[in-house]
């Protein structure tokens, strides 16, 4: 699905994910877990469509609100990483900001993934859902 968006294989997708996460000091496992949770393991099926390259539901608030659109996988993952960094830290971004919702985040309020509950998503247990996915990696 992403051959024309810069990631013809899942290996390419993961390499881009790791590169973007490491550049901003965000744990790649968190980015991956969130992308898998938000997209149903890249099957999508909710408001966000695969071609949007929006792997974290940025701006998708339900009721048909599709959210942000990124021109390629790298920019979509960069926006996700930047949004996670906004929640987790007050440090400046390394790369130019591509996250359209970056300025709406109270910086540094969720330095741990569990703190994303009730912030990134309405569910109070959202961060714990991410933690469960991360724990399954080992």
How would you label these PLM feature ranges?
Residues 1-138:
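Catalytic cores of secreted/periplasmic lytic hydrolases that degrade extracellular macromolecules
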């Amino acid at each position: 699905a992403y051959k024309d968006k810069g990631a013809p294989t899942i290996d390419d997708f993961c390499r881009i994910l790791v590169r973007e996460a490491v550049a901003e000091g965000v744990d790649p496992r968190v980015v991956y877990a969130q992308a898998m949770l938000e997209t149903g393991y890249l099957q999508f099926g909710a408001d966000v469509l695969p071609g949007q390259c929006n792997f974290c539901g940025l701006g998708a608030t339900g009721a048909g609100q599709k959210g942000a659109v990124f021109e390629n996988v790298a920019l979509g993952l960069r926006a996700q990483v930047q949004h996670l960094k906004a929640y987790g830290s007050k440090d400046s971004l390394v790369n130019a900001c591509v996250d359209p919702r970056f300025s709406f985040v109270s910086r540094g309020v969720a330095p741990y993934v569990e703190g994303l509950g009730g912030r990134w998503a309405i569910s109070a247990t959202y961060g714990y859902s991410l933690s469960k996915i991360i724990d399954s990696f080992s």
